[in-house]
């Protein structure tokens, strides 16, 4: 079974559904919630629903 929340590291995110999102160089996560993350470059990453 897939984890119920995202796994976040310095260089990327593994979403609850198993999708790997590589962060661009110099970009970090400034806010993380149960269904999405806001990045320091203004991008918004939405996780797929499980």
From Swiss-Prot:
| Superkingdom in the source lineage | Eukaryota
Q: In which tissues is it expressed?
A: Calcified shell.
Among its keywords, does the record have Transferase? Answer: no
Question: Spans of the sequence repeats?
Answer: 6-23, 30-47
Enumerate the UniProt keywords alphabetically: Cuticle, Repeat
Q: Which GO terms describe its molecular function?
A: structural constituent of cuticle
The chain's disulfide connectivity reads: none
UniProt cross-references to Pfam families, sorted A to Z: Cuticle_1
Q: What is this protein called?
A: Cuticle protein CP498
Q: Give the source species.
A: Cancer pagurus
């Amino acid at each position: 079974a897939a984890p119920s929340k995202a796994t976040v590291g310095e260089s990327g995110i593994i979403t609850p559904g198993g999708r790997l999102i590589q962060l661009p160089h110099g970009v970090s996560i400034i806010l993380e919630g149960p269904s999405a993350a806001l990045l320091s470059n203004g991008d918004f990453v939405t996780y797929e629903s499980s």
